[in-house]
Swiss-Prot record:
Keyword line: Autophagy, Endoplasmic reticulum, ER-Golgi transport, Membrane, Protein transport, Transport
Composition skew (Polar residues), residue ranges: 123-133, 153-164, 424-459, 682-691, 741-752, 848-857, 1040-1059, 1516-1533, 1553-1562
Membrane-related topology note: Peripheral membrane protein
Ranges of Basic and acidic residues composition bias in the record: 138-148, 473-482, 708-724, 1588-1606, 1623-1656
Skewed-composition ranges (Pro residues): 512-526, 655-667, 1728-1739, 1760-1772
Family the UniProt entry places it in: Belongs to the SEC16 family.
Transmembrane segments: none
Name listed for the protein in its UniProt record: COPII coat assembly protein sec16
Keyword Signal: no
Biased composition (Low complexity): 624-638, 668-678, 817-832, 1447-1458, 1740-1759
Localisation: Endoplasmic reticulum membrane
């Protein structure tokens, strides 16, 4: 009793709650024990901790232990014996129902145990029917194992007990020691006996006799350990006692060590308990000697895996327990503890002769052998069990051999050898600290419950494994008979042994340090095993079976290893028995991992084990698998041979020396193992791969599977046959149990070995060594390994691996991570592991790889393989070029992907091809980089754009788009509402607010579209807006009646103090009355305010000046409203607005002090600064809703002020909502300082970059607003002229995304808008024209359809009736005329083609001519249509300009190249278009402002001429100046033209500047600076003098006069005077011409009709001159007269023979020539004409400025459509503007000069006009529309 108490007090492993009961029970048991009390003081101490743990973990166990203690100590041993059988058959039932047997029964059973011991040599039938002849221990082992049969891996008693306890008792207990387990087991047994007395009794009877001897020996060593209480505790745990004879003794000896470990067992895995149990058997105690199945074993018997954190004692506890157990074990098992004895025992056990083993150590060996002989499978399983339990576990193994071996794939052949070896290893280790360490591994081994499942799993796996059974790898250590289906062929397995032998040599040196690891018994045996394996490895390919056999003989640890092995061996177990021999040899390699390390199994068994254990220690358990892998790769090859992974040859060649310690695929095994067996067993490289040198790279993989299993065996051996091997096999659940304890030791010992194996297996050097293999391995090996892994995993291995390994994987995460590196055996086992880099990814536990190759293989093998493949391929060197490219520091000669992004979303890509080139004398190929295939693809195929559910219906042209637009807006709103806030915006406090406001902005636009742009007059629109601004309001207010509203207020009124002040003070009212009596209303008001009589004050103030009223309201708001509550900002602002304090209303939301950055403290409310003064911004919705629901006169100003306030605080969307609803917002360009909105949702005032202006959503939303306010609202004018440029940007973005058809539609829409606008804007500048033209041209080039070019226009014309257009042109006589009259587009096409030809020939002259001709024609028609058609003219001009853009688009290729040069061409080809462009910019303003707007339009023509001159100038070089100027102007949209030119300097007609000022307002200031300069001067002068006169005469006449006048300006500085004279002449000539033409029109019906209406020739004949007053008859008669008119080619006009004045206009041409030369100069930028122009331009400039684009617009009217495109750039030339009209003569006369003269003459005379029309008669027709001679002139 004293000892037990001491033990209890001494054992730290006991848990506090268990210490008392367990101590009592153990004390009783110790007292009852014969020798155990004295011998097992240490053991008891150690055992009692385990008992405490058991009790602590399982409360019922304590209680049962107490019962069993009360029953008697002797019963415990008997009961233990009974438990042994029970563990076999009824371990599950016992575990499940431990309490069923009565205490008496348990006692009786305990009493039977001595009998079992006595019957050690007798055959004892177990409940399972197993009969063991050798010894009671063996019999009991068989019996115990029979229950374990379902769980072959649950060989460690402690682990099993713990697992059982965990599973059934709900407590997670780590059996620190066998003794501890026994003491607890006594309680458990007592409990179990209570639960199932009959069963235990039977088993006890059978096993008692067989186990009495063994248990007696154990009792002699450690009586307290085997005391009945411990046995009872075990039984209570539900763990049957394992009756082990000699094996039990060895186990007890190991248990002693395990018990030392068990001190730390609470911290360690159940393996510590297992080891302690093993050590206790080494002790002489009978009861303690009786090895009870560990919880894991019992669970294994139940085929249940218990994963309890307590099941595995901490490594330190296991070590401590082992240390304690070792001394006790030394008493009886000193031989076993000695390494020599251990080696002998192992050899005896390994040899299939059980009789050879000594009774103590020999007895253990004999028992092991007997057990092995009896049941190879059982021995294998028992070996696993023994790994955890130790020699006692060997008995368990026997039972397991009987039952569980059948289940475990590798039970029969190899298990017997292993269990024996492990007990021996445990015995030698027990005496030393290695025993303690072994105890820790034992705890790791304690993961037997897992092993149980694994065994069952392996049983399931057995069928598939048979083919590749590697029984030899594991089982053959102890017995060759066992073979695992995963084992490589015998050839491979044997070479592994040989390698193992070599490893043994290597490992032994390394093992020298291992003795410390040896502290954990397991590490040492692995060393022995490793010593043995080298021989098998060496003989791996030759005779794997025999070498494995030797290896196993050397390795006592393999028995413990079966547990871990079942996990890994589960793969091999299937065909362990017969087929295993050859394949098992592959399987032995798993054992070999440890055996390989030992090298010579038998000879080195004893001593080598400890050193080898230390070898693993040398490797850091947590050391990187990759790093160790490299050094250990050689070892891996040796071991690998056994596994025959791809590395057999490779590994051997690569790292055979290092590999001995591990079982990396040995080179020999590589040869044979490289064959299918490795594949079958592992997903390792194919046999050929392993054989290949390249396999060396993958050798880690090949060897890694082998090494992994060998490691498992090695660990088992090194760890006293404890589950340490399982630990390398960390995958299996047994590993999990054993890992906690093993990992420390196994990490040190086995872990390093595994690391070595991994190193050997995946040696980086190996890969490099066989570069060819790298390429081969990546593909072949990867596929091979994947296939192998798949079969292995898919087969029974998968079941076991999945069931067991996966648990290990689960557990390994916490343990394997550190183990993973040390115990990368899994990595070494699987070819994947050979890939170090992959393994880290594959193995979450460790960066280097999964702890278990099996696990890794199953889940990761496929992925790792590709990764591996890639890595090797990357290692290959490139063949450097010899042409100097090799000096490129960027090494571009190696090749790189090349991408080129083209127009229309096209992407051209080219990837380099890396071709391996082999050369003589090189093992690895070298890479030759060659260009790959060039592919053309669409960007959308690579980066598909995020398209909404609904596609945008743009461009928005008609009302039919409304429905689609609403649907698109709704889809976008839904997307915004469901989208998450970007991460980069989440830091912003206003991110959520901005998101809501953005959604609200889109909703407002949707309401605007739904209500056709009208919000004020519609009740539905008002309701919709209210619901948006107040989503929570909805119908809450309508649901309340007025009565309801007043009722509550009435009830609250008595409580409302504010209502009282008005009537509270009667004296104040009297004073007020007196003041009013005196007539001092203002004084009365402020008195009432002071007295807070607000009603009085407001009534009186309402009769006074508004300022007083506003002040009163302001005071009321500040003193009453603002202080009432905290949310009155919106109400206060609204009252301010009602009072008329519009600008001050925002002060109620955000005080000025806050806007100034100050924080004011209120002295009244006392709130201080608690409130954020900026919170008032959040009231903007309420304020907006109040204002919209209660409109007041100036509330729009208040909304604008509110919007500006919000904008200042970066609340852009909210500000834009206020702007939109105010209806007073200004939309404009970025350069407009007055613009409130440029794009909806974009703050143009705070642009960090221009990227925001390219946002498609903002552009499209703004387009939707424009659509709602213009198209849907019925407005014919675009309200947002600046938006065209953004639409062009959007069109470009569409083209970039490959949506070219939509981009073309936008181009067409922009061109149509430019033509349709009646009031050109400064934003309609040359850049816009050129941009549209260029994009259209590129789209036409990349698409088959016509696009928006002039070609498409004819097609459009065809749609409208191209035949009629041709017929009309034919009837009219001039196709160009008809074209121009019929439709600017078609007309321009024909004439343009002609004109373009001329300009093409000579751009400068042709431009002048063209512009001149067009201007003339345009001037004539425009004048005719000018007033009525002026806007249309400007509209026409724009259309013309686009048309000309298109017409010139035929020349787009030239123009598109660059604006400068193309402009020249375009101008040359179409000068009129340039004028048109000018008109678009300035014409309208000029027209609008000056009465002579039409004439201004004519001057703009002259400006067009300047544009043409610009083109010409560009040719001459002078144009560049103007053009560049123009460019600058265009950049500044409004003033692009004028600014370009120096018209302002020319602006000598400062008088006109006043005019310009007038027109300037029209332009809005865009063009004023620039456009004014160039175009206005001429137009201004013409407007000033001739314009008035011309207007008096006729609009058209005025135009010609203007032109002539301007031509004069163009000609020279005298041009002004000449212009005046010419204008007078022109007026007269025009009048005469009108008359003559009228007559001619009457005479010639053809000419009049087309000119008049531009309709059909019929209309021309019949109604062409109807405007003039010509009748059908008179027309015919006049037609004859018209014959008097002839076209003078020199004058380029019609000359009336009858009218001598007709020739005079021709004379007028000379002045223009003078001017024309200068104009061209002016165009070119020459000073001469510009001065002339300059004089007018100033006037024009000023005039143009007024119109902002005034100068240009006039020109537009002057030469409407044709010049617009080309003209815009030339717009700069001022003289030309005048000359432009005149240019018609230029064709006949020299370039520009003819224009002015011609234009003057033409303008002044009908002939001139007619001449111009011939050049381009379109304008003439237009003039005719005006009802003038235009038609005749055109003809």
């Amino acid at each position: 009793m004293a000892q037990p108490e001491g033990v209890l007090a001494w054992n730290p492993a006991f848990r506090p709650e268990d210490n008392d009961s367990v101590a009592t029970d153990l004390a009783r048991l110790a007292l009852d024990s014969k020798k155990e009390v004295s011998e097992t003081t240490d053991l008891d101490t150690h055992a009692s901790p385990s008992a405490e743990e058991v009790t602590e973990e399982n409360g019922p166990i304590e209680f049962k232990a107490a019962i069993s203690a009360d029953t008697g100590d002797q019963g415990a041993p008997d009961f233990v014996d009974s438990n042994m059988p029970a563990a076999d058959d009824s371990s599950k039932p016992d575990i499940e129902e431990p309490e069923e047997p009565s205490c008496d029964e348990s006692i009786s059973m305990q009493t039977d145990e001595p009998r079992a011991v006595e019957d050690v040599t007798e055959n004892v039938p177990t409940e399972n029917g197993n009969v063991d002849i050798t010894s009671g221990l063996r019999l009991e082992e068989h019996v115990a194992e029979e229950p374990h049969y379902g769980v072959p891996e649950n060989s460690t008693g402690l682990a099993s007990q713990n697992d059982a306890q965990d599973l059934f008792e709900g407590a997670d207990t780590a059996w620190m020691d066998e003794a501890e387990g026994e003491e607890n087991g006594a309680t458990v047994n007592g409990e179990a006996s209570d639960t199932r007395p009959g069963f235990w009794d039977n088993l006890g009877d059978n096993e008692r006799d067989n186990e009495d001897d063994f248990f007696n020996q154990l009792k002699t060593q450690t009586k307290p350990i085997y005391s009945p209480p411990e046995t009872e505790s075990r039984f209570e745990e539900g763990i049957p006692l394992l009756g082990h004879g000699a094996a039990t003794q060895n186990d007890h000896a190991q248990k002693g060590e395990s018990q030392l470990d068990d001190v730390f067992g609470g911290d360690e895995d159940d393996e510590s308990g297992f080891f302690s149990e093993i050590q206790k058997p080494t002790s002489a105690e009978g009861p303690s000697h009786i090895t009870r199945k560990s919880t894991s074993q019992v669970i294994d018997s139940l085929n249940a895996v218990s994963d309890s954190p307590f099941s595995e004692p901490s490594p330190t506890a296991v070590e401590f327990n082992n240390g304690l157990t070792v001394p006790t074990a030394d008493g009886e098992i000193k031989k076993a503890p000695s390494e020599e004895d251990l080696a002998a025992r192992w050899q005896a056990e390994l040899s299939d002769d059980a009789d050879e083993t000594m009774p103590t150590e020999d007895d253990l060996a004999a028992r092991w052998q007997a057990e092995l002989d009896d049941d190879d499978d059982d021995l294998l399983l028992d070996y696993d069990t023994t790994n955890a339990q130790g020699p006692p576990e060997a008995a368990n193994i026997d039972h397991m051999n009987d039952s569980s071996i059948l289940q475990s794939p590798f039970g029969t052949p190899e298990n017997p050898a292993r269990p024996k070896m492990q007990p021996v290893s445990y015995t030698p280790h027990q005496p030393s600290t290695s025993g303690l360490l072994s105890g820790i591994p034992a705890q790791n081994t304690a993961a037997q419950p897992t092993n149980a499942s694994m065994s069952s799993y392996f049983s399931a796996q057995a069928p598939p494994n048979p083919v590749t059974t590697r029984a030899e790898s594991f089982a053959e250590r102890s017995k060759e008979g066992y073979k695992s289906p995963y084992d490589l062929p015998e050839d491979l397995a044997r070479p592994r042994r040989a390698v193992a032998s070599s490893r043994t040599v290597v490992a032994q040196p390394g093992t020298v340090p291992q003795p410390p690891p040896r502290s954990s018994s397991i590490p040492a045996p692995p060393l022995k095993a490793s010593t043995v394996p080298p021989a098998p490895l060496g003989t791996s390919s030759a005779a794997p079976t025999a070498p494995q056999k030797n290896f196993f003989e050397e390795l006592p640890l393999p028995p413990p290893r079966p547990k871990s092995r079942p996990a890994s061996s589960g793969r091999y177990t299937p065909n362990a028995t017969v087929c295993a021999p050859s394949v098992p040899q592959s399987i032995p390699p798993p054992a070999n991992p440890y055996s390989n390390v030992p090298g010579a199994p038998q000879s080195n068994i004893g001593p080598p084990n400890p050193p080898q254990l230390q070898q693993p220690e040398r490797l850091d358990p947590y050391s990187n698998l990759l790093a160790p892998n490299v050094p250990s790769a050689p070892a891996v090859p040796s071991t690998a041979s056994r596994y025959s992974p791809r590395p057999p040859g490779l590994q051997a060649g690569v790292k055979p020396p290092p590999s001995p310690r591990y079982s990396p695929a040995p080179p020999q095994s590589t040869n044979a193992a490289a064959a299918a067996p490795p594949r079958n067993r592992y997903a390792s490289q194919p046999a050929s791969i392993s054989g290949q040198g390249a396999a060396l790279q993958f050798q880690p993989r090949t060897s890694s599977p082998l090494a992994y299993h060998e490691k498992i065996h090695y660990q088992d051996q090194g760890q006293s046959e404890e589950r340490p091997q399982l630990q390398p096999t960390a995958i299996p659940p047994p590993l999990n149990h054993s890992h906690p304890s093993e990992q420390p030791v196994s990490s040190e010992n086995k872990g390093p070995s595994s690391a070595d194996v991994l190193e050997n297996m995946p040696p980086v050097s190996t890969r490099p060594q066989s570069p060819p293999k790298n390429p081969y391995a990546p593909s072949a090996y990867t596929s091979e390994f994947a296939k192998r892994a798949a079969p292995v995993s898919t087969g029974p291995p998968i079941a076991g691996m999945t069931g067991v390994l996966n648990p290990s994987t689960e557990e390994s995460p916490f343990v394997p991570p550190r183990r993973s590196q040390t115990q990368s055996p899994s990595q070494t086992l699987s070819p994947r592991l050979s890939v170090p880099s992959l393994d880290p990814f594959q193995r979450p536990a460790s960066v280097h790889g999964s702890t278990s190759p099996t696990r890794t293989v199953n889940p990761y093998a496929p992925a790792p393989v590709p990764t591996h493949n890639r890595a090797p391929s990357q290692v290959l060197e490139f063949i450097p070029p010899t042409d100097g490219q090799q000096l490129d520091s960027l090494e571009r000669w190696k090749g790189a992907p090349i991408f080129k992004f083209g127009f229309g979303g096209a992407v051209i890509s080219c990837f380099p091809k890396h071709i391996p080139r082999y050369s003589a004398g090189q093992a690895a190929p070298m890479i030759k980089s060659c260009p790959g295939e060039v592919r053309v693809s669409q960007l959308n195929d690579w980066l598909p754009a995020a398209e909404g559910i609904v596609q945008h219906p743009g461009p928005l042209k008609g009302k039919s788009k409304k429905k689609d637009l609403v649907a698109w807006l709704s889809s976008k709103i839904a997307a915004f509402e469901n989208a998450d806030i970007p991460d980069f915006d989440r830091l912003s406090p206003d991110a959520t607010k901005r998101r809501e406001e953005k959604t609200l902005l889109w909703k407002v636009i949707r309401v605007l579209v739904e209500n056709d742009g009208v919000l004020e007059g519609s009740v539905e629109a008002q309701k919709s807006l209210r619901n948006l601004l107040f989503p929570n309001l909805q119908d809450s207010v309508p649901n309340q009646s007025l009565g309801d509203g007043f009722t509550p207020s009435t009830t609250l009124q008595p409580l409302n103090a504010p209502s009282q002040p008005d009537a509270v003070d009667p004296r104040s009212v009297d004073s007020l009355r007196d003041t009013l009596v005196l007539g001092e209303r203002e004084k009365a008001v402020w008195a009432a305010v002071d007295k807070r009589l607000w009603g009085h004050a407001m009534i009186i103030a309402s009769t006074m000046d508004r300022s007083v009223w506003q002040q009163v309201v302001q005071e009321f708001v500040r003193r009453e409203v603002r202080s009432a509550t905290s949310r009155t900002e919106s109400l206060a602002a609204f009252y301010e607005i009602l009072a008329g304090n519009v600008e001050e209303s925002i002060d109620e939301l955000v005080p000025p002090s806050a806007r100034a950055g100050l924080q004011m403290i209120s002295k009244v409310d006392g709130h201080g600064t608690a409130k954020n003064s900026l919170d008032g911004l959040d009231s903007w919705r309420e304020t907006l809703g109040l204002v919209l629901s209660n409109r007041s006169p100036d509330d729009q100003r208040a909304l604008v002020a509110l919007g500006r306030l919000l904008l200042s605080y970066n609340r852009t969307e909210a500000a834009h909502i206020c702007f939109i609803l105010s209806r007073a917002a200004v939309f404009g360009g970025v350069d407009d300082p007055l613009a409130n909105i440029v794009l909806l949702g974009v703050d143009h005032q705070r642009l960090a970059s221009s990227a925001a202006l390219y946002d498609d959503d903002s552009i499209l939303l703004t387009e939707a607003y424009e659509f709602a306010t213009s198209v849907l609202a019925g407005s014919s004018v675009s309200t947002l002229p600046h938006l065209l440029a953004f639409k062009l940007i959007h069109a470009w973005s569409l083209a970039d995304r490959g949506r070219k058809s939509e981009a073309q539609q936008y181009c067409d829409a922009i061109a149509a808008a430019l033509k349709a606008t009646t009031k050109p804007s400064g934003y309609h500048n040359q850049h816009l024209f050129f941009g549209v033209d260029e994009l259209s041209a590129r789209l036409r080039e990349t698409t088959s359809d016509g696009g928006s070019s002039w070609i498409s226009r004819p097609s459009m014309e065809k749609v409208s009736g191209s035949m009629w257009a041709k017929f009309n042109s034919f009837v009219a006589g001039d196709d160009s005329d008809a074209a121009s009259t019929g439709s600017g587009k078609a007309e321009e096409i024909g004439p343009f083609a002609r004109v373009s030809g001329t300009p093409t020939i000579s751009r400068s002259p042709s431009v002048s001519d063209i512009y001149g001709s067009y201007p003339v024609a345009a001037a004539q028609p425009l004048p005719g249509t000018g007033p009525s058609r002026y806007q249309p003219v400007s509209h026409y001009a724009p259309s013309a300009s686009p048309e000309q853009l298109r017409g010139r688009s035929s020349m787009d290729s030239q123009r598109s190249s660059s604006f400068g040069y193309p402009l020249g061409q375009r101008r040359g080809s179409q000068e009129p278009s340039t004028p048109v462009d000018t008109n678009m910019f300035h014409g309208m303003p000029m027209y609008g402002s000056p009465p002579v707007a039409g004439y201004q339009s004519t001057p703009p023509q002259s400006s067009y001429m300047p544009l043409a001159p610009v083109a010409e100038d560009s040719a001459s070089g002078a144009q560049q100046g103007p053009f560049s100027a123009y460019s600058q102007v265009s950049d500044s949209a409004p003033s692009h033209r004028p600014s370009a030119y120096a018209p302002e300097p020319f602006g000598h007609p400062f008088d006109t500047q006043g005019v310009s000022t007038t027109s300037q307002p029209d332009q809005g200031g865009y063009m004023p600076p620039a456009s004014t300069g160039a175009y206005e001067p001429p137009s201004v002068e013409s407007n000033t003098e001739p314009a008035d006169g011309v207007r008096d005469e006729s609009t058209e006449e005025d135009k010609p006069k203007k032109k002539s006048f301007m031509d004069e300006d163009d000609d020279e500085d005298l041009a002004a005077r000449a212009a005046a004279i010419q204008k007078a002449e022109r007026a007269r000539r025009d009048r005469e011409a009108d008359e003559a033409f009228r007559k001619a029109a009457e005479a010639d019906a053809k000419k009049p009709p087309p000119a008049t209406e531009k309709k059909g020739w019929f209309s021309g004949w019949f109604g062409g001159k109807k405007d003039d007053n010509s009748g059908g008859g008179p027309i015919r008669a006049k037609l004859g007269e018209e014959n008097s008119f002839y076209y003078d080619t020199e004058l380029k006009k019609w000359v009336n023979k009858k009218d001598p004045g007709s020739a005079a206009p021709t004379r007028g041409t000379p002045p223009p020539p003078k001017g024309s030369a200068p104009p061209s100069r002016s165009m070119s930028g020459s000073g001469g004409p510009p001065p002339a122009m300059a004089t007018p331009p100033p006037t024009g400039a000023s005039g143009s400025r007024p119109s902002s684009s005034a100068g240009a617009p006039p020109s537009v009217s002057a030469s409407p459509a044709p010049p617009s495109l080309g003209a815009p750039p030339p717009a700069i030339p001022r003289s030309v503007s005048t000359g432009a009209v005149l240019p018609t003569p230029p064709s006949s006369s020299a370039g520009a000069p003819p224009r002015p003269a011609t234009s003057l003459s033409n303008a002044s005379s009908i002939d001139d006009l007619l001449g111009a029309p011939q050049a381009r008669k379109g304008p003439a027709a237009r003039g005719k529309k005006k009802g003038r001679y235009v038609d005749v002139m055109a003809k």
